[in-house]
Amino acid sequence: VHDGPKMGGYSYRMPAYPVAPGTEVPTEDMVIMTTMPVKSLITSPATGTQMTGKTLDIRGHTWADGDVASVHVSHDFGQTWQEAKLEKPVNRYAWQHFSATIELPQAGYYEIWSRATDMEGCTQPVTTPGWNPRGYGNNMVHRIAVLAG
């Protein structure tokens, strides 16, 4: 059951098999998404932020098909991870909020990464999980750039 024409064609559908970027996939080879992969997004600070100090407060949202078990953040390209504080969702369909404070070791450029893990042990991948025409299901580790002063 769906609510009209916006649910046709490629809407909420992914290729039934792996395809190369840019490939035209026939509508009959598309399948409806039935699950939501675990995902987190950093919502603050904005990418490109220039800081005066080395202490960074991070906030964001996370979701999954089921419950999210944890969110971790990294400032060293995933070499080390720090657990973020994860708030309980307001209901079973709501995004969860997370926050963390990290100390950057010195002035310079940093990529801050967030990575969520669900209760089944599925974790966001560091690389793109696979191309599809609308980008559905892209749950790659989220990154922002900051410049610490």
For the regions a language model picked out, list residue spans one by one:
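Extended, aromatic/histidine-rich regions of cofactor-dependent oxidoreductases associated
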Residues: V1-G149
